[in-house]
C-alpha cells in the first residue's frame, strides 16, 4: 500500500523587542543565568503583567506579511501545566481568540506553486530553560528566557513532504527577517519548530493518528526527523500495529525520535481568560499604520530582480531567499554596472565559501570580503586589468586577508598581459614545445587547440588576455 505523509507545523519565533512581553527585563540573548529576570517574569505573588505594545505590533506585522486576517478583538489566556522551567505553573498565551488567523504563504516546489495555509498566529510568553549537564545531582533552571515574547505560527496540515516543509520554513524565516519581526537565529533558540506528522493511505481523506516532534534545532534536523518518523509510522501500520498519539523527541546524533509523553489535548491545559490583562483591541488605523511599515518582501524583491535586472528566476530566488544575502547583493551593485557578473559571483564563489565554512546566509557580513570589494574585483575583470582566472585567485586572497583586490593585483604583479608581441612570443613557444598537439589540431582534433591555449596561459602564468591568446594562436597555427 502506498502512503501519504501529512504535516502541520507549530513555529515559535522570538519577537525582536528590546524588553520582555510583560515586564521591562531585557530580551538580550546570553548573560549569566537568572540575571535577566524580575518578580514579574518569575511569577512572584502580588505582581501584575503589563503587555508590551511593540510585541503586539510585531505580531500584527507578521500576520499581515503572511496574508492573515487581523482580529479586531482578541484576548490572552492562561495555559496551565506544571514544568520546572515555568515558574507560575501557567503560561500566558492565546487560546480561542488569536490575534491573526486564516493566512497563507505560497511556496514553489519543483516549479509548481503551492499554497500553505496559516491557521493562526498568536502571542505568548516563553518559558525558562532547563540545564541538565551542569550539576550532577539534578537539573538547573535559568529564567533569563522566561517572559521573552513569542509568536506561535500554526499551519494547516497542507505539507506533504520533508522538501515542502524545508521550502516553507525557509520562506517563513525570510519573511520574519525581512520584516525584522524576529532574527530567527535557530542556534540561539529564537526560531523553534515542532512538527505534527501522520500518514494515511494515498487517496484517503481521513487523517491518521499524529505525533508531535520536538527538539528540532535546524532545518536539516526537521528534514531528517520527518523522513524518519514517516518511515517509523508506516512500518508500525504495515506490521499491524497502531500509531500512538504522543510527543516525541528528536535525537539528532542518533537520527531517531524517542517517545516523551502521550500527546495532550486542549482540555488538559484548563485554559481560561487571563484575569490580569485586558482584551487586545485593534482598530483599522493601527493596522494600516503597521501595513505601511512592511518593507519589500522576498517575493516582491524576486520579481523586481527579474524585471529590473534581467536575472533568471532561479538566481533571483536564491539572492532574495535571505535578507542578508539580498542586502549584500544590492550594496555590491551600487559600485558596479555589471549586475549579471555580481549575481554570478554571489551565486558561485560567495555561496561556496559560505558552505565551505559552515556559515548561514545571515552570516555573510562576517566574511572579510565586503560588497564594494567584490564590485571592485568585477570591475577589474570588466576593464581587462585581470582575467577571470586571475580574478578567482585574487578572490581567494581577499577572503583570507580582507585586502582590496587592487592591492593584491599590484602586490603580486597580476595585471593582465594585453601586449600582442608578448603574447605572440608565448604562443610561438607553446607551438614549438608541443608539435604533437599542433599536428592533432591540423588533423581536426579541436581538443588540441584547448590544450595549446592552456600551455600559453601556463607560460604567461595565467596573465595573458584569453581572447588575444585565442586570436593569435589561431593565426599562428594557420601559418603552419
Swiss-Prot record:
PROSITE patterns from the UniProt entry: GATB (PS01234)
Cited Gene3D superfamilies: 1.10.10.410, GatB domain, N-terminal subdomain
Coiled-coil zones: none
Keyword set includes Transcription: no
Purpose of the protein: Allows the formation of correctly charged Asn-tRNA(Asn) or Gln-tRNA(Gln) through the transamidation of misacylated Asp-tRNA(Asn) or Glu-tRNA(Gln) in organisms which lack either or both of asparaginyl-tRNA or glutaminyl-tRNA synthetases. The reaction takes place in the presence of glutamine and ATP through an activated phospho-Asp-tRNA(Asn) or phospho-Glu-tRNA(Gln).
Record text on subunit structure and interactions: Heterotrimer of A, B and C subunits.
EC number: 6.3.5.-
Organism listed in the record: Caldicellulosiruptor bescii (strain ATCC BAA-1888 / DSM 6725 / KCTC 15123 / Z-1320)
Protein family membership: Belongs to the GatB/GatE family. GatB subfamily.
Catalysed reactions, as listed in the record: L-glutamyl-tRNA(Gln) + L-glutamine + ATP + H2O = L-glutaminyl-tRNA(Gln) + L-glutamate + ADP + phosphate + H(+); L-aspartyl-tRNA(Asn) + L-glutamine + ATP + H2O = L-asparaginyl-tRNA(Asn) + L-glutamate + ADP + phosphate + 2 H(+)
Pfam families assigned: GatB_N (PF02934), GatB_Yqey (PF02637)
One GO MF term: asparaginyl-tRNA synthase (glutamine-hydrolyzing) activity
Protein name, UniProt field: Aspartyl/glutamyl-tRNA(Asn/Gln) amidotransferase subunit B
Any Gene Ontology biological process: glutaminyl-tRNAGln biosynthesis via transamidation
Record carries keyword Magnesium: no
UniProt keyword terms in alphabetical order: ATP-binding, Ligase, Nucleotide-binding, Protein biosynthesis
UniProt-listed InterPro entries: Asn/Gln-tRNA_amidoTrfase_suB/E, Asn/Gln-tRNA_Trfase_suB/E_cat, Asn/Gln_amidotransferase, Asn/Gln_tRNA_amidoTrase-B-like, GatB, GatB_C_1, GatB_Yqey_C_2, Gln-tRNA_amidoTrfase_suB_CS
Amino acid at each position: 500500500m502506498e502512503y501519504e505523509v501529512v504535516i502541520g507545523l507549530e513555529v515559535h519565533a522570538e519577537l525582536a523587542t528590546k524588553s520582555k512581553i510583560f515586564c521591562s527585563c531585557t530580551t538580550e540573548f546570553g548573560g549569566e543565568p537568572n540575571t535577566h529576570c524580575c518578580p514579574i517574569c518569575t511569577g512572584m505573588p502580588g505582581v501584575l503583567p503589563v503587555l508590551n505594545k511593540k510585541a503586539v505590533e510585531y505580531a500584527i506585522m507578521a500576520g499581515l506579511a503572511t496574508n492573515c486576517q487581523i482580529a479586531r478583538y482578541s484576548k490572552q489566556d492562561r495555559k496551565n501545566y506544571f514544568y520546572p522551567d515555568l515558574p507560575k505553573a501557567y503560561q500566558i498565551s492565546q487560546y480561542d481568540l488569536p490575534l491573526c488567523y486564516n493566512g497563507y504563504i505560497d511556496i514553489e516546489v519543483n516549479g509548481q506553486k503551492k499554497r500553505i495555509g496559516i491557521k493562526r498566529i498568536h502571542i505568548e510568553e516563553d518559558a525558562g530553560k532547563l540545564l541538565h549537564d551542569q550539576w550532577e545531582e539534578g537539573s538547573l533552571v535559568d529564567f533569563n528566557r522566561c517572559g521573552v515574547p513569542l509568536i506561535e505560527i500554526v499551519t494547516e496540515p497542507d505539507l506533504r513532504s520533508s522538501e515542502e516543509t524545508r521550502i516553507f520554513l525557509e520562506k517563513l524565516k525570510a519573511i520574519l527577517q525581512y520584516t525584522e519581526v524576529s532574527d530567527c537565529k535557530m542556534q540561539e533558540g529564537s526560531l523553534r519548530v515542532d512538527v505534527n506528522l501522520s500518514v494515511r493511505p494515498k487517496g484517503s481523506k481521513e487523517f491518521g493518528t499524529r505525533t508531535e516532534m520536538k527538539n528540532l534545532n535546524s532545518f536539516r534536523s526537521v528534514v531528517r526527523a520527518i523522513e524518519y518518523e514517516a518511515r517509523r509510522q508506516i512500518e508500525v501500520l504495515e506490521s499491524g500495529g497502531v500509531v500512538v498519539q504522543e510527543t516525541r523527541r528528536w535525537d539528532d546524533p542518533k537520527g531517531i525520535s524517542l517517545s516523551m509523553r502521550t500527546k495532550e489535548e486542549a482540555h488538559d491545559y484548563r485554559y481560561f481568560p487571563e484575569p490580569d490583562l485586558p482584551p487586545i483591541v485593534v482598530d483599522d488605523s493601527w493596522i494600516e499604520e503597521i501595513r505601511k511599515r512592511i518593507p519589500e518582501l522576498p517575493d516582491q524583491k524576486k520579481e523586481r530582480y527579474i524585471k529590473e535586472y534581467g536575472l533568471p528566476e532561479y538566481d533571483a530566488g536564491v539572492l532574495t531567499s535571505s535578507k542578508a544575502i539580498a542586502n549584500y547583493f544590492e550594496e555590491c551593485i551600487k559600485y558596479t554596472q555589471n549586475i549579471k557578473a555580481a549575481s554570478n559571483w554571489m551565486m558561485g564563489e560567495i555561496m561556496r565559501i559560505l558552505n565551505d565554512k559552515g556559515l548561514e546566509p545571515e552570516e555573510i557580513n562576517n566574511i572579510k570580503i565586503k560588497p564594494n570589494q567584490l564590485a571592485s574585483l568585477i570591475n577589474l575583470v570588466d576593464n581587462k586589468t585581470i582575467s577571470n582566472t586571475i580574478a578567482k585567485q585574487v578572490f581567494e586572497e581577499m577572503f583570507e586577508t580582507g585586502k582590496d583586490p587592487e592591492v593584491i593585483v599590484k602586490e603580486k604583479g597580476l595585471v593582465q598581459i594585453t601586449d600582442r608581441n608578448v603574447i605572440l612570443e608565448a604562443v610561438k613557444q607553446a607551438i614549438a614545445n608541443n608539435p604533437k598537439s599542433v599536428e592533432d589540431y591540423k588533423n581536426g582534433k579541436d581538443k588540441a587547440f584547448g590544450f595549446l591555449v592552456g600551455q600559453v596561459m601556463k607560460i604567461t602564468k595565467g596573465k595573458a588576455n584569453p581572447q588575444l591568446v585565442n586570436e593569435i594562436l589561431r593565426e599562428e597555427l594557420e601559418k603552419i
